[in-house]
Amino acid sequence: FSREGVTGSFMLSEYLPALKGTYGDTTVYVMEGRTDGPSMLVLGVTHPNEPSGHMAAISLVEHCTVDSGTLYVIPRANNSAFTHNDAQEASPHFYHLQTASGTREFVFGSRATNPLDQWPDPDVYTHQPSGQNLSGSETRNLNRGYPGVANGNMTERACYAITELIKDKEIDITVDLHESSPEYPTINAMVAHESAMELASNALLDMMLDGVQISLEPSPPTLHGLTHRELGDFTDTLPVLMETANPSHGRLRGATNEELVLTGKDPYY
């Protein structure tokens, strides 16, 4: 990703050395503007089976230049989840994009940390520090682990390091990019912490004026572990999660293949 707009990079393990040398570590790209200004963090792939966020993050790294302030981008927020895909879903291992420089190949990963890196799942996952109980498999879901645990499992450690990065760099805005099935109630939507509602409302109006139909949802205060809740509660950042639809996640879909991932078109939807 060496591009003109990138002014530096570092590893997430700088904020938790226990991640170094593991698949929980990942690269953070930095794009500094010509003048001082606010800072923003983009989490590209919390769930690597949701490729639009990955492509958005890569596009920022490869093509974005910053005039004022600093942009931080993590294209592979859950790096371990790129090393496998979800069992019994018949998902493709890769998808390909045709570009002016030739064909580019990208990994279609999993929603969760690889069990080779974190096993076994408990029967019940207890989120820290809220004490909320969730299904045991959610222990490998990066978006159920915030604000993280320094001596926790790999997923909790990655969440902890991202939270510490936000605190250290005094990140003003954090955007977490996602996809979901068309039947999921929160799609084509932004979910914002109460501290970020004014920001998200202004963004929504701008997007609708540009012809993008999107809704705004408040972050549930009692649903814990998610970026839009915990990063707003435990740091000073303004967190917003963005969710778009793709039938490749849907329960009603037909063949799960590369064409479906890329086009988002399925005859059953």
Label the model's feature ranges.
Residues 33-39:
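Proline/glycine-enriched tight loop/beta-turn segments at coil->beta junctions
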Residues 47-55:
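Di-metal (Zn2+ and/or Mg2+/Mn2+) metal-binding site signature of metallo-dependent hydrolases
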Residues 42-44, 74-76, 176, 215-217:
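Active-site neighborhood of phospho(di)ester-bond hydrolases with catalytic His/Asp-centered motifs
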